Amino acid sequence: MPVINIEDLTEKDKLKMEVDQLKKEVTLERMMVSKCCEEVRDYIEERSGEDPLVKGIPEDKNPFKELKGGCVIS
């Protein structure tokens, strides 16, 4: 898809592009923000038991755990 420089377009072309965009947007299904927030909250709460950021990572499976001991170079 080619890039369009808006400054190079006539006023008529700009308005036509705006109308085309609005035609696309009018067909989108919209939901109330309060309903979306409820669904997102419920989704997060349902999966919080599996979330390693909430639950934590078991020490034996933590790939970032500092290794004990060291390396001796001789």
Curated annotation (Swiss-Prot):
Lipid-carrying residues in chain (S-farnesyl cysteine): C71
Localization annotation: Cell membrane
Primary location recorded for the protein, binned into one broad class: membrane
GO cellular component terms given for this protein: heterotrimeric G-protein complex; photoreceptor inner segment; photoreceptor outer segment
Propeptide residues per the UniProt entry: 72-74
Modified residues (Cysteine methyl ester): C71
GO biological process: cardiac muscle cell apoptotic process; cellular response to hypoxia; eye photoreceptor cell development; G protein-coupled receptor signaling pathway; phototransduction; protein localization
SMART domains to which the protein is assigned, alphabetical: G_gamma (SM01224), GGL (SM00224)
PROSITE patterns: G_PROTEIN_GAMMA (PS50058)
Pfam families tied to this protein: G-gamma (PF00631)
Membrane topology term: Lipid-anchor
GO molecular function, one term: G-protein beta-subunit binding
Keyword Lipoprotein part of the UniProt annotation: yes
Tissue: Retinal rod outer segment.
Similarity comment: family membership: Belongs to the G protein gamma family.
Physiological role: Guanine nucleotide-binding proteins (G proteins) are involved as a modulator or transducer in various transmembrane signaling systems. The beta and gamma chains are required for the GTPase activity, for replacement of GDP by GTP, and for G protein-effector interaction.
Subunit structure: G proteins are composed of 3 units, alpha, beta and gamma.
Protein name: Guanine nucleotide-binding protein G(T) subunit gamma-T1
Source species: Mus musculus (Mouse)
